[in-house]
């Protein structure tokens, strides 16, 4: 069994400049951080003792004979993209969906990470970010920018720059004292 824990993110500056329609023409940059709220994905092989081959547990339970029958678009497309079969996947989170903190992208990154582990392959932070962007923006055709997937994959406090269909991540290093000060003066609404 593989268990992943992927952080959620909040942005400080640059929201909207992570949209390809914007940054391909003008460039873009965001400052974001992950924080101590997470999504958890478990993935394991499902023995052939059941009358279904894939089980997905989130706010619903889906049991299907083939991953292409899954209603959840991100899971269906990720399983097809990485050729995953005969699995039980569960999703839990510290925060509700649609909170504005990148929950769907954290789920995508955590799920892809779990799938790579199940296959015995290493996926770098960069690879996870790029695959999550492809999954959500291309395969699932969800509107939005790129910062959520990148923040979830890289974690920490970062400046993320966007230009010409690509991105780069630069960690922002701050002292433990400054981090405590920042944490004690932030409020989320």
Language-model-derived ranges and their functions:
Residues 1-65:
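Generic N-terminal targeting/processing segments that precede catalytic cores or assembly contacts
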Residues 2-7, 13, 18-28, 117-189:
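ATP-dependent small-molecule kinase catalytic core of the GHMP/sugar-kinase superfamily
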